[in-house]
Amino acid sequence: MKYQDLLAIAGCIANAGAVSVSGAAEGFAKGVTGGGSATAVYPSTTAELVSYLGDSEARVIVLTKTFDFTGTEGTTTATGCAPWGTASACQLAINQNNWCTNYEPNAPSVSVTYDNAGILGITVKSNKSLIGSGSSGVIKGKGLRIVSGASNIIIQNIAITDINPKYVWGGDAITIDNADMVWIDHVTTARIGRQHLVLGTSASNRVTISNNYFNGVSSYSATCDGYHYWGIYLDGSNDLVTMKGNYIYHFSGRSPKVQGNTLLHAVNNYWYDSSGHAFEIGSGGYVLAEGNVFQNIDTIVQSPVDGQLFTSPDSNTNKVCSTYLGHVCQVNGFGSSGTFSQADTGFLSNFAGKNIASASAYTAVQSTVPSSAGQGKI
């Protein structure tokens, strides 16, 4: 065997041993294993990445470069609409499923040209771990779709960027719908047309969203101010969602919107710099928020709250949590932010017997989360 061949084999063995899932999921998706101990594969083309994610094998898929889907499926020029005006900083809307026609009939019609690859994400099937190597694993121009019964999936240490950011309905970064046991960890999302994360109307069951950096800075937004509106939308029919340690930055709304039948434990997250609101809680949204920091968030929760909300308002009230979560809830911290005080307790029994993420005092969040959330921070 040639010396060069031996070096290549040694390099592959080193790579396979060097990259693996870091840590373990806390909260509702505790126990998720993804691709488990499967031999790591290293896709080199967009087609190979799509194939690995969409097959029936248990896989550990390692990204070592940028996979740019821009232009891979062509572009479409069509008539859309401008619901928020035609100023240069305003998002335009694609007339997807006749949205402009049905919901914005009075909005000006405009020509839109968008990249087809962004509209629908890459299908991710069961028993997959998708891992980035260092800070080099990027999916550009296309998101991920965990749907149709997919389960036991880990997405860790990657970035998803640049999905038709000018256009509403241009595509989502991560879609979860009709799934179970999904862990999204240390992912960075930026410059997305629609939702950075969406859990659709079917049951997504047990999901943990941890240590991610949702970056809402954009040249285009529905509020025409550079603050992305479409952040995180949790709309499932039977969803248990843990959000812990996330950095949610520069949004003007829906960060998150919670409704359907969704139990959300929002713990030790850092919201920073919003031109609108953070939480929007619709019917069927049940939110417990503890140990978070809200900095420069004028409207923490949009009125009215049509679901139920426990904001962990004070140490005495928070004692009720110990019965159902196994710990006294932590108060939240605020800086230059609006009010956030509601103590609905009727839904707290829904946490009983579940896997619950631990909670730290909010004082540790501001100094640690921005520097530890997102890709390359493991």
Curated annotation (Swiss-Prot):
GO molecular function, one term: pectin lyase activity
Enzyme's top EC category: lyase
Highest taxon in the source lineage: Eukaryota
The family this protein is said to belong to: Belongs to the polysaccharide lyase 1 family.
Signal sequence annotation: 1-18
Alphabetical list of InterPro entries matching this protein: Pec_lyase, Pectin_lyas_fold, Pectin_lyase_fold/virulence, PEL
Protein name listed in UniProt: Probable pectin lyase B
Cysteines joined through disulfide linkages: C81-C100, C90-C224, C321-C329
Protein species of origin: Aspergillus fumigatus (strain ATCC MYA-4609 / CBS 101355 / FGSC A1100 / Af293)
Glycan-carrying positions: N127
Annotated localization: Secreted
Entry function: Pectinolytic enzymes consist of four classes of enzymes: pectin lyase, polygalacturonase, pectin methylesterase and rhamnogalacturonase. Among pectinolytic enzymes, pectin lyase is the most important in depolymerization of pectin, since it cleaves internal glycosidic bonds of highly methylated pectins.
UniProt record, GO biological process: cell wall organization; pectin catabolic process
Catalyzed chemical reaction(s): Eliminative cleavage of (1->4)-alpha-D-galacturonan methyl ester to give oligosaccharides with 4-deoxy-6-O-methyl-alpha-D-galact-4-enuronosyl groups at their non-reducing ends
Gene Ontology CC annotation, any one: extracellular region
